């Protein structure tokens, strides 16, 4: 993904005010009207607007910072609208607005991220009211803006005469007033409807990644918005995820660690045999290359790390105690005398 901070020439810790200031300066510098016929300047102008569209939105910026935002797509008219709104405080030209973007969650299993998986998501979006055809009721043209939805004023700038179009304060930019309100949608023109969409979750997706589904947001006069699906990975009963790597905590008994053992560890594609060498200590790690999740760009897979945790028994049979005391004597380790803890407990009971 592009480095939007570098495009605007700001640091990753930049405030919203600093981002806005940098955007205005660069947008004016590379505006096509200032650079007629310059294709490079035109591309820079698009990049600058694209970067600002993401970094000026706190939710999109947070997702971008975590690397969880898919590359957005913007129509050229959206970028020019953004320029006029941010630089001059007005929209460049009037057209029916798109519906709002929506966000929902899609839950996946860890195994789903190995090869990718198709998932069905249920969510609710706004669609035109069938009772009134999306009009909200019986409409009459607004007398203030004569049905245009905007009022115009003119000002001079270094671009020449700039026509400032602002939303009509009487009809709030709609261009009409409601003579009668539709009872089904209460004049809103849209009603909620439960939808289903099937999406393909790519391999290796991170927790919290935003998966963009174009055209599945709320429906508006200018077309639908987009649906963003936030990836939620259900916890695995045995494996922990650390980026593309997986971690399995293997509990070994004292005898297994000292003498070595052949064990089986769980993997995403089935059990994996593992030979534990004699003398393995607590905290040792065995790296099984290729046992993790897919790496970005098809560069193979991460590592399954098996972390050894020694399981010290809390209770021993008399025979096991005798064998351990014999071992301690053999290697010269000092241990508590036999019956010491029982005598100590009895002392405190008195």
Curated annotation (Swiss-Prot):
Zinc finger map (CR-type): 116-194
J domain location: 3-68
Keyword Cytoplasm: yes
Positions bound to Zn(2+) 1: 129, 132, 182, 185
CXXCXGXG motif repeat placement: 129-136, 142-149, 168-175, 182-189
UniProt GO cellular component terms: cytoplasm
Keywords: Chaperone, Cytoplasm, DNA replication, Metal-binding, Repeat, Stress response, Zinc, Zinc-finger
One GO MF term attached to the UniProt entry: ATP binding
One Pfam family here: DnaJ
Binding site for Zn(2+) 2: 142, 145, 168, 171
One GO term of the biological process aspect: chaperone cofactor-dependent protein refolding
Cofactor: how and how many bound: Binds 2 Zn(2+) ions per monomer.
Subcellular localization(s) per the UniProt record: Cytoplasm
Cofactor(s) recorded in Swiss-Prot or TrEMBL: Zn(2+)
Xref: HAMAP family: DnaJ
Domain notes: The J domain is necessary and sufficient to stimulate DnaK ATPase activity. Zinc center 1 plays an important role in the autonomous, DnaK-independent chaperone activity of DnaJ. Zinc center 2 is essential for interaction with DnaK and for DnaJ activity.
Chain's role: Participates actively in the response to hyperosmotic and heat shock by preventing the aggregation of stress-denatured proteins and by disaggregating proteins, also in an autonomous, DnaK-independent fashion. Unfolded proteins bind initially to DnaJ; upon interaction with the DnaJ-bound protein, DnaK hydrolyzes its bound ATP, resulting in the formation of a stable complex. GrpE releases ADP from DnaK; ATP binding to DnaK triggers the release of the substrate protein, thus completing the reaction cycle.
Name assigned to this protein: Chaperone protein DnaJ
Taxon lineage: Bacteria, Thermotogati, Deinococcota, Deinococci, Thermales
